[in-house]
């Protein structure tokens, strides 16, 4: 990215109005495909001349604007090499260029907002593990929680419309609509899910960019009303980007309640509402009665229906007590556990017993989904019994051990924040025995004979527990400090979580 920094220094006052010319710049596609400026930007494809990369993009966009090419039959597309064999390839080229172009102003705004807030170590805030210390601090004092799955729009036109209030470039929106109608035939009111899924797989960066704009629009509206509806100002987080024409956009939503906007917000007064989101899932938690949680629930439903025209079933949003139910978020089952403690006190000649209740957040590893994932990857069966990995048997011993080691380290790195480590030890045992069976299969031997010949200490150095590493580092430290490092450990270098 550093070699392209000179191209990203746009004029701050004009950055919204000049996105369209960026689509015709070579370095945009070099950024999209992570290639050098002088290298080819297209993947290898039979029958394609990769010497005319940007020229073909320009010709393709020009033809899209010609009226006689807006409607092309299937027979013509088979004859024309521009729209025939390489149609999916050209679709991916333009979508990647569009995705990078619309992300540039947001990146500059994000950098500017972090500089104004004097946030130097902003990379620590990006770690998804930074959410769990917030859970540990706030959730033991809350009563109700609701996990909300943000619904996906039924039409990509809704995603494009959300961009109008973030970028003031009419030419870019016109090209976006023309691109979708030209390549994907988005000419029906309701787009089949299969077509959206196929388009998302072929153009992941473009679909993800549109979805992020939709989620950002939803979150900005929600946080705006969260701040306005609370007696206390929100200090722990804020909206990074400026809202545009917000009051005009909510006019249709206000008519639903048939009341004044301020009187509507009066029912949502809740200074103890907490909101956390990652990708398409969000968590709402509150200290007050479930009545206010239901108000927020139906507010979100009406917001999706009236503002984004997305249908959401109220029955899919559940409101549960934290002390009785667990919620699934970022690969953990979390709940609030009550630890009773009895203290005996004596005053003069009288003694009495005091019972104290301590609330603590528990984070538990979902062992059954993890075993299913390992079984799907052929590391074990559905019951959790380790099996060999025959696909890796052709590799060298070092490569086999290194592959298993990398998976084991990643799981240990992510799930070291669990309150109960027994499930993590079971996952490590499955991977360890699967590695041994794979090595024994390669050498055409049994596990017992293989371990007897090479020794059971063969894999000890590859599967060293992180707790043992900490105990070696702090061998001379106090026992309290050693217990601290044997507990939950959250890392600030985990930026992504794959479901």
Swiss-Prot record:
Q: Where in the cell is it found?
A: Plastid, Chloroplast
Predominant localisation class: plastid
- Name a GO molecular-function annotation: RNA binding
An example of a Gene Ontology cellular component annotation for this protein is: chloroplast
Gene Ontology BP terms: mRNA processing; RNA splicing; tRNA processing
Alphabetic keyword roster: Chloroplast, mRNA processing, Plastid, RNA-binding, tRNA processing
Q: Output the Pfam families linked to this UniProt entry.
A: Intron_maturas2, MatK_N
Concerning its family, UniProt says: Belongs to the intron maturase 2 family. MatK subfamily.
Q: What does this protein do?
A: Usually encoded in the trnK tRNA gene intron. Probably assists in splicing its own and other chloroplast group II introns.
Please give the name of this protein.
Maturase K
In its UniProt entry, the species of origin is given as Neltuma juliflora
